């Protein structure tokens, strides 16, 4: 199966379960992490033909997605004597995808890269759309570029080795897509047998459908708003809260998708308090998240600090926080005129 991301410039295809043989007449630099390399690198190498292949592994986890690790990656690229015709392959989850794309975008002012995601979260979100970057002390993904891959290959085979926690985290991003753009997808999600899904024993077709539905939705959004001027902001549903939670917990307590799950619950509570979402729809999202074992609560210790952290969000402008809300489910809304009092009141409900 193939889905084309039809951009005015730099259009590309996402191949789902179609990874066969990749041929290059240049050097190839594979960026991965130790776990994925141990599980799947031999499989990937058997499918690549190139002049030379270089392999670099970096520690995985949001806490390592920073400028220090980026410098390490770039040094390995220079030591490999890559040129502008070389190709970087990001082979891993969302962290590897973000860092690999960023490295490719700034190495010698840009080289080609290909995403081969190995987590569900990366398949449905991080690997498609061209957002790249790293975190710093001020927040998540505040340093980065928009830089599109030449191709993306999503293989359900790789997902079979994921933990139930990793699969659930990917499902959170899929739920986000449904809540913003297609209410009917929630019906599909509710029919999935959570036990076989979380054990990765479900039919490959389930993974294929999840990936395809997500990419079809996201590609349509990216095609209309590649640089996130407005419409693409809706893909950040739950993320305004999630990024603060991740930053406050040093990126160690929650997987990204888990933080997004909590963020969606918080965003829904805000929408509920503002009269933009009804209780039944808010509860429906909670029930679906719980079905897949995702967290739905976070204890805020200092409401004022949490509130101030919102202003480091990339969607904030002119001292206003742009919140992405579901109003109703299946239809996203960007609202930047919410009073501090209303925001604080919602945050206090999570103390």
UniProtKB/Swiss-Prot annotation:
Cofactors, names only: NAD(+); Co(2+); Zn(2+)
Compartment list: Cytoplasm
Highest taxon of source: Bacteria
InterPro entries named in the record: Dehydroquinate_synthase, DHQ_synth_AroB, DHQ_synth_fam, DHQS/DOIS_N, DHQS_C
Pfam families reported for this sequence: DHQ_synthase, DHQS_C
Keyword Nucleotide-binding: yes
CDD domains on file: DHQS
Annotated binding of NAD(+), by residue: 60-65, 94-98, 118-119, 131, 140, 158-161
HAMAP family in UniProt: DHQ_synthase (MF_00110)
NCBIfam families reported in the protein's UniProt record: aroB
Identification of the protein by name: 3-dehydroquinate synthase
Taxonomic source organism: Campylobacter jejuni subsp. jejuni serotype O:2 (strain ATCC 700819 / NCTC 11168)
Chain's gene name: aroB
């Amino acid at each position: 199966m193939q889905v084309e991301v039809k951009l005015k410039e730099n259009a590309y295809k996402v191949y789902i379960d179609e990874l066969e043989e990749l041929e290059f007449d240049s050097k190839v630099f594979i960026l991965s992490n130790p776990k994925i390399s141990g599980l799947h690198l031999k499989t990937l190498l058997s499918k690549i033909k190139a002049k030379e292949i270089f392999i670099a592994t970096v520690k995985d986890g949001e806490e390592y997605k920073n400028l220090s690790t980026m410098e390490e990656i770039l040094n390995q690229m220079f030591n490999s004597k890559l040129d502008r015709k070389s190709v970087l392959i990001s082979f891993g989850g969302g962290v590897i995808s973000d860092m690999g794309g960023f490295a490719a975008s700034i190495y010698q002012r840009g080289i080609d890269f290909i995403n081969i995601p190995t987590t569900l979260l990366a398949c449905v979100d991080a690997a498609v759309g061209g957002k790249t970057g790293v975190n710093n002390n001020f927040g998540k993904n505040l340093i980065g570029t928009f830089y599109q891959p030449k191709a993306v290959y999503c293989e359900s085979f790789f997902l079979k080795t994921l933990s139930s926690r990793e699969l659930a985290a990917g499902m959170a991003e899929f739920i986000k897509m449904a809540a913003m753009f297609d209410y009917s997808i929630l019906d599909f999600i509710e029919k999935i047998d959570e036990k076989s899904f979380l054990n990765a024993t479900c039919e490959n077709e389930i993974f294929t459908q999840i990936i395809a539905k997500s990419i079809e939705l996201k590609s349509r959004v990216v095609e209309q708003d590649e640089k996130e001027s407005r419409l693409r902001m809706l893909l950040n549903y739950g993320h305004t809260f999630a990024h603060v939670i991740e930053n406050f917990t040093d990126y160690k307590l929650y997987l990204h998708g888990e933080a997004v799950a909590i963020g969606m619950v918080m965003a829904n509570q805000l929408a509920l308090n503002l009269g933009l979402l009804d209780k039944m729809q808010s509860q429906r999202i909670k029930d679906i998240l719980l079905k897949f074992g995702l967290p739905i609560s976070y204890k805020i210790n200092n409401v004022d600090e949490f509130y101030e952290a919102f202003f480091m969000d990339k969607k904030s402008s002119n001292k206003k926080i742009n919140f992405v809300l579901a109003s109703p489910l299946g239809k996203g809304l960007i609202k930047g005129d919410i009073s501090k009092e209303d925001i604080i009141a919602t945050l206090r409900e999570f103390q």
